[in-house]
Amino acid sequence: KKSEKLFSDALNSLRKTYITNFSDQIIYIINYVIDELTKNPLLLKFISKNLSWGVYNKTILKLQDKVEENNLYNLFMQGIKENNVKLENPDVTLFMIIELVGSTCFNSILYKDPLSIEDYKPYLYKVIRNLLEN
């Protein structure tokens, strides 16, 4: 539930911006999540290994599809269609992005290892953009 709320808050924040580029939208959401986890180390420790659960749990996806069209999964799938992004397996790509964020940011946020999170972000965002390129 905590990671689900984190992504929901990120989407609500995105809706208040004028970001229209698909990759920039995904980076915005990831940046929002990282910044929130940086502000709340206890939350980071609590959900560090299960960040993708809030987006990818099949039960949640089914409920959200009925209740809320605007979740990260739907934004991602809609974005790749609208932008003609050719991904071999969009589900796997989204899962990889979220897992990459969850697994690599933990040490950067808590221990500044291998870099502080602010120094690490450009590397992370470059990899995410590469995953989203045609």
Q: Where are the language model's segments positioned?
A:
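Generic C-terminal helix-cap and adjacent flexible tail
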Residues: L132-N134
